[in-house]
């Protein structure tokens, strides 16, 4: 006849089940990403969904807003990406690619979660409005210089033709 001593005791099985139960949530939860890692993950997702010919790479990450500690809660993000020289069809990390000279810059906003198991982001990107504003400033300065140059040119033309005008002596 077998006794309890011959087989594993109920206490040992309880301990094994307890340890399994403690490790299961860790496997389901996954790794917690840093704010920057979550944004880089979102950039990878944007590249996968993009119809553009080249990959985009993170150019600038706006400062991290104050956030709660829950990695499952979506966190607001704002960043810019710039077009690289690498075609989207190659299997390469965007961080390995150089930025394309005069490449398209996009301003992106949305949310990311830091829990990698959730793998959640909701990002939308537009052409960088800040670059458009800078272009407007450049065009304004160019217009002012052209206007100033034209005024000087008109005055020189008047002075030149003024020399040939008949003079009346009084």
Curated annotation (Swiss-Prot):
Signal peptide: 1-30
Subcellular localization, as worded in the UniProt entry: Secreted; Vesicle
Gene Ontology molecular function, alphabetical: lipopolysaccharide binding
GO CC terms, sorted: extracellular space; vesicle
Database matches in InterPro entries: Cathelicidin-like (IPR001894), Cathelicidin_CS (IPR018216), Cathlecidin_C (IPR022746), Cystatin_sf (IPR046350)
Primary localization class, coarse: secreted
Positions annotated as propeptide: 31-131
Domain of life the protein comes from: Eukaryota
A family per Pfam: Cathelicidins
Location of the region described as Active core in the Swiss-Prot/TrEMBL record: 150-162
Keywords: Antibiotic, Antimicrobial, Disulfide bond, Immunity, Innate immunity, Secreted, Signal
Keyword Ribonucleoprotein attributed: no
Entry keyword Coiled coil: no
Domain notes: The cathelin-like domain (CLD), which is the propeptide part, does not seem to exhibit auto-inhibitory function, as it does not inhibit the antibacterial activity of antibacterial peptide LL-37.
Function: Antimicrobial protein that is an integral component of the innate immune system. Binds to bacterial lipopolysaccharides (LPS). Acts via neutrophil N-formyl peptide receptors to enhance the release of CXCL2. Postsecretory processing generates multiple cathelicidin antimicrobial peptides with various lengths which act as a topical antimicrobial defense in sweat on skin. The unprocessed precursor form, cathelicidin antimicrobial peptide, inhibits the growth of Gram-negative E.coli and E.aerogenes with efficiencies comparable to that of the mature peptide LL-37 (in vitro).
Family: Belongs to the cathelicidin family.
Stated name of the protein: Cathelicidin antimicrobial peptide
Organism (species): Callithrix jacchus
Lineage: Eukaryota, Metazoa, Chordata, Craniata, Vertebrata
């Amino acid at each position: 006849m077998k006794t309890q001593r011959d087989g594993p005791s109920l206490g040992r099985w309880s301990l094994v089940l307890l340890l399994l139960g403690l490790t299961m949530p860790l496997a389901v939860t996954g790794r917690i990403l840093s704010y920057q890692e979550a944004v880089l993950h979102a950039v990878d997702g944007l590249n996968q969904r993009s119809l553009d010919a080249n990959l985009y790479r993170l150019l600038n990450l706006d400062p991290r807003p104050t956030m709660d500690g829950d990695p499952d809660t979506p966190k607001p993000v704002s960043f810019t990406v710039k077009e690289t020289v690498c075609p989207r069809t190659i299997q390469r990390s965007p961080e390995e690619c150089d930025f394309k000279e005069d490449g398209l810059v996009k301003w992106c906003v949305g949310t990311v979660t830091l829990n990698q198991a959730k793998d959640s982001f909701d990002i939308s990107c537009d052409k960088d409005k800040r670059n458009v504003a800078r272009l407007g400033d450049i065009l304004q300065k160019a217009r002012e210089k052209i206007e100033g140059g034209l005024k000087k040119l008109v005055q020189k033309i008047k002075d030149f033709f003024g020399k040939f005008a008949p003079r009346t002596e009084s």
